[in-house]
């Protein structure tokens, strides 16, 4: 079977691995925090402390990490060159995790066989975005979170956060990103300090 790896194995990444288990695949993951041994055994997962060690053996790499300074342009020319030749990237996280021009060059050279994703940078994508004319790509306009079940989950989460705020009680860690000016809860688990907001200025360079 194919070797499939996820960059990050939080709620979304782990759910992706669970969905792929029935398809006779070899599943891999890279994350700053290792999953519990019972989960690894349940899904027969191979953990990689180093991202590049996973990339060189995977036929498909799915990106499920947030955008922060450590992941901005994580997949650039150098990183993609370390991937298994002819591999595929699936990016449903954030567009700027992948260097758009590096991806296009890798498709053209054959280093990547294809690229699929639900996210662009900038977004919405301008008419001259290189991915619009790139061969072997499957792109959608950031619609993966618009299912009825996802919308219901968002609404329930917002309500719970507001109720905690007005009641003066602690917000659950899974909803917490920053507290007292510091990363906290899920934010401390998944993000790094710094700013990726320069992307907003970069986006103004594109034609509409």
Where on the chain are the PLM-derived regions?
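Glycine-rich NAD(P)-binding loop of Rossmann-like domains
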Residues: 1-15, 180
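Residues at the starts of beta-strands that form the adenosine-phosphate
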Residues: 3, 25-26
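Gly/Ala-rich phosphate-binding loop of Rossmann-like dinucleotide-binding domains
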Residues: 17, 21, 107-108
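Short, structured coil segments at secondary-structure junctions
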Residues: 23, 43-44, 133-135
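Conserved acidic E/D residue at the C-terminus of a beta-strand in Rossmann-like folds
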Residues: 29-31
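Rossmann-like adenosine-cofactor binding region
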Residues: 34-130
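C-terminal helix-to-coil terminal segments
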Residues: 121-208
